[in-house]
Amino acid sequence: MAVFFVEIGQDVHFEGQWLEDAINEGVRQGYTEGYLRKSVVGDPLIRENTKDNTPAVLHIRIVEGDRVKIKVAPKGFGSENMSRVFMLKPADGIEGVRHAILTAVKDAGPNACPPMVVGVGIGGTFEKCALLAKQALTRPVDEHSDIPYVKDLEEEMLSKINQLGIG
């Protein structure tokens, strides 16, 4: 499934086709002409495949300026099935975060399709955490946070995850 994060400058004006329609047309062409796996169903209860992986998931944010920035995260449903949400109490602190991350990766085990890339969202509501985690997956894998203590946590968790010996 194609997940898009779109930042639109407040001074941008689109003409012609609606942005959502244009993105879905791009997804349609990419999946039908690019020989990519078609795995999206229009209605999850009926299970009828759309055969072109539309509609895409769009997250749109209005920002300052006159530019458009689009990031796309092609997601397989194996990775979606391995997603986890942990609601921690404030008293759980950073240890609770560490435990939750390792538990999620351990539980996913070999069921997640390689390579395993872990996105973590911390704070806010249920939906905000999921969105933050998904946005984290759009960062280059060799890029770390600019915040020193977050960078330290990322490096620590990568080391501990690799020590699990999952693959």
PLM-predicted stretches and their roles:
Residues 1:
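N-terminal glycine-rich anion-binding loops that anchor highly charged ligand groups
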Residues 4-120, 125-167:
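Non-transmembrane, aqueous-exposed alpha-helical and coiled segments at domain scale
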